[in-house]
UniProtKB/Swiss-Prot annotation:
The modification Phosphoserine is found at S9. The lineage of its organism: Eukaryota, Metazoa, Chordata, Craniata, Vertebrata. It comes from Homo sapiens (Human). This is Eukaryotic translation initiation factor 1b. The modification N-acetylserine is found at S2. Gene3D superfamilies: SUI1-like domain (3.30.780.10).
Length: 113
């Protein structure tokens, strides 16, 4: 007699990785740009999720030259190769990746304060 009406409802607590088929065509993964607090006012910006097609050391070299900061590529046990830059470079990295065409706007995820 009674039917369940919300079988098709969205579950906000469902595992986010199960919805990969809902992403627009041409998007592989997200690029996460995070900021981490160091001692005092010093910060680190980390970039994770850049495809293996790109040479991360060359990207770091371009970032260092354009943003006038130091940077390196580290191997993270969970996330793989991660780019670390000194200072708050979140906006600069977003603009650079969009200008060069490495990423689309909807693929960027900026985390932090």
């Amino acid at each position: 007699m009674s039917t369940i009406q919300n079988l098709q409802s969205f579950d906000p607590f469902a595992d986010a990785t199960k919805g990969d088929d809902l992403l627009p065509a041409g998007t592989e993964d997200y690029i996460h740009i995070r900021i981490q607090q160091r001692n005092g006012r010093k910060t680190l910006t980390t970039v994770q999720g850049i495809a293996d097609d790109y040479d991360k050391k060359k990207l770091v070299k371009a970032f260092k030259k354009k943003f006038a900061c130091n940077g390196t590529v580290i191997e993270h046990p969970e996330y793989g190769e991660v780019i670390q830059l000194q200072g708050d470079q979140r906006k600069n990295i977003c603009q650079f990746l969009l200008e060069v065409g490495i990423v689309k706007e909807e693929q960027l995820k900026v985390h932090g304060f």
